[in-house]
Amino acid sequence: MIPVPDIVSPRVRLLVSVRDAAEAALARDHGADLIDAKDPDRGALGALLPETVRAIAAASGDRLTSAVAGEPRDAAEASACLAALAGTGVGYLKIAWAPGCDAVGLVLPARLPVIAVLFAEDGPSGADVPALAAAGFSGAMIDTRGKDGRRLTDHLSLTQLAGFAAACRAEGLLSGLAGSLALDDIPALAALGPGYLGFRGGLCARADRTGRLDPERIAEGARRLAAFVPRVEAA
């Protein structure tokens, strides 16, 4: 049975991006709340092969799972990317989506939640969220397109990120924040009340996102988030 994503949760949870089944098991055993299938060698949202995603879903046990489906140019390509991974056993899919992108022709998989991932470099804001809800997305996340050392907060202020998270709550959407995050970013970003904080490089040795995950860093991230209780006003 596929674990069902918890769209509204009072606790900020840990998303760990993994590249294979071995990393999925590592993330599962050291406290990841959500195990996210992604190829770090192919940019911000590099999709893995369906068979690799299936293996990751199987190795994740009872943890929630997701898989990135790529960076499509338009709604038609997005539909095809999502369809390619719809039968892999993950709890939901993620797809790159530009603010203001025309959703006409977008076909989302039946009974499988899809998260729109907006890139921080494009200047997304809470004003973009209602259109995402209207298009049928179940959630929205901000990540960084470039993996050049700049972090999420180098592109967007905490005030802007707080507005985005609040808009997601108002629309009943799952929300997430990611983008070269370090463990020390947890207090400031968790206080904004997103559903998830997403990590890859910050949980790898030497902060190299293309390297292997460090189990001690995963456990530390889980511990810090479990200990942090954000105070978020109801939308």
Residue ranges and their predicted role:
Residues 50-60, 103-106, 199-235:
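C-terminal helical cap(s) of enzyme catalytic domains, especially alpha/beta-barrels
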Residues 12-33:
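N-terminal basic/disordered segments at the start of proteins
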Residues 34, 38-64, 68-69:
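Glycine/small-residue-rich interface belts in oligomeric ring/scaffold proteins
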Residues 34-45, 88-100, 139-149, 192-218:
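Glycine-rich phosphate-binding active-site loops on the catalytic face of alpha/beta enzymes
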Residues 27, 56, 140, 189:
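Conserved, mostly hydrophobic/aromatic
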Residues 1-17, 58, 233-235:
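N-terminal amphipathic alpha-helix/helix-capping segment at the start of soluble metabolic enzymes
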Residues 19, 44-52, 77-80, 152-160, ...:
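Alpha-helix N-cap and loop-to-helix initiation/capping positions
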